[in-house]
């Protein structure tokens, strides 16, 4: 049975990936900061699907903890076939109003962790001739909206570039770019009422999102943008004049996942 390592696996999109991959008979390595919560998730998945579930508590903004996760990906005796880089970090304030230390921590999680873990996972996959790298990015990466958007733009470009580099190896790389998703992400940013952020039609279901992404992975697609509404929106954003794109980026009462 294949093994998938998922970061940010205790809730939201990461949990949806864990459930979907367990249902597809993947053993799991679940990574998040909250070990107690991970243990509960692991117990439920073992009982429901009969798969092995390993828990690895780690704060990916901490370089020592990140290296422990990278070591797990490199372990030749316990190969990982699927890497899902999903760990998130919300930024509450605009760049000029915020704390640079918080911005740096966000980049450690959203950029450096993706870089380090992908570099640890991909070479063993290539050596075995199969595997998949999935990076959870965001449609925010197509906007001009501060450090979070810039980090997601990097994640998308990095992963799509990696897909080209991996062509012919049997290993795929896919950047998942969701819009607004019904998870705990916005509640953690202090936004309890989702209607303040976006209308009801804009919100996506995490389980459906993951199912669509895994279908794109199986097709070898480098970019997965769920739902027609977001595919149309991102196409428009990429082709509008810069002045208009900047105006859209300034209007940010909340962010897509």
Model-assigned labels for residue ranges:
Residues 10-11:
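Conserved glycine-rich cofactor-binding loop
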Residues 24-40:
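Conserved glycine-rich Rossmann-like NAD(P)H-binding loop of the short-chain dehydrogenase/reductase
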Residues 94-96, 102-107:
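Substrate-binding pocket helix/loop in short-chain dehydrogenase/reductase
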Residues 118, 151-154:
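Active-site helix of classical SDR
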Residues 118-119, 160:
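A short, exposed helix-loop element centered on a Lys and neighboring polar residues
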Residues 138:
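Residue(s) in the substrate-gating loop at a strand-loop-helix junction
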Residues 175, 196-233:
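C-terminal helical subdomain
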């Amino acid at each position: 049975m294949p093994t998938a390592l998922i970061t940010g696996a205790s809730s939201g999109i990461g949990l949806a990936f864990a459930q979907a991959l367990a249902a597809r008979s993947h053993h799991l390595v679940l990574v998040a900061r909250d070990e107690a919560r991970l243990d509960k998730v692991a117990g439920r998945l073992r009982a429901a699907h009969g798969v092995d579930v390993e828990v690895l508590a780690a704060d990916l903004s901490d370089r020592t903890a990140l290296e422990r996760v990278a070591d797990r990906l490199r372990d030749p005796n316990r190969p990982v076939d699927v890497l899902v880089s999903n760990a998130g970090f919300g930024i509450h304030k605009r760049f000029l109003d915020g704390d640079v230390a918080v911005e740096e921590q966000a980049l450690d999680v959203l950029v450096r962790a993706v870089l380090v873990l992908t570099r640890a996972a991909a070479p063993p996959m290539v050596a075995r001739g199969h595997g998949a790298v999935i990076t959870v990015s965001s449609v925010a990466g197509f906007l001009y909206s501060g450090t979070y958007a810039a980090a997601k733009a990097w994640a998308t470009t990095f992963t799509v570039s990696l897909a080209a580099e991996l062509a012919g190896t049997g290993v795929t790389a896919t950047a998942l770019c969701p819009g607004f998703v019904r998870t705990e992400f916005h509640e953690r940013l202090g936004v309890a009422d989702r209607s303040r952020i976006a209308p009801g039609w804009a919100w996506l279901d995490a389980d459906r999102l993951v199912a669509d992404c895994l279908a794109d992975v199986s097709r070898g697609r480098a970019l997965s943008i769920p739902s027609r509404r977001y595919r149309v929106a991102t196409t428009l954003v990429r082709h509008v004049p810069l002045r208009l794109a900047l105006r859209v980026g300034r209007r940010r009462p909340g962010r897509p996942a």
